[in-house]
Amino acid sequence: MKDEEWDDVIATNLTGTFNLTKALIKNMIKNRYGRIINISSVSGLMGNPGQVNYSSAKAGLSGFTKSLAKEVGSRGITVNSVAPGFIETDMTAYLDDNAKAKLIEDIPLKRLGSVQDISDLVIFLSSEDASYITGQTISVDGGLFMY
């Protein structure tokens, strides 16, 4: 892997999250309320061959989420992370039928997820119903990675 490939992925997935959070957190602290929901990946939880940069960045988001949750929880702010598995998106559209079938073999629910599966969790974590959930990385992966 070239240094540039490493740097670009870390900058997008980890540094970008830091910069966005830094820009928004002061207002949340002032209002004593906020919901921060980071988008990670099961690759950050279980690793993925050929994606050491991506897996490292997404694993870093889990640490970021936990640490920030401890820092700002007393101010009414929850911080969580959603870790999608294999979801029907542009990232999986390139897979041929054989590759897709092989992936599905390893998923206990025997299907790829949908964007709706992810958005439903994000909406829940944004709501008052999730006011006692913080510092968590929640997988939406059909059971692919259980810990």
What are these regions, as identified by a protein language model?
Residues 1, 47-55, 67, 95:
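Active-site loop-to-helix junction immediately N-terminal to the catalytic Tyr of the SDR YXXXK motif
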Residues 41:
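Residue(s) in the substrate-gating loop at a strand-loop-helix junction
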Residues 46-52, 74-75, 110, 128:
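Active-site loop immediately N-terminal to the catalytic Tyr-X3-Lys motif
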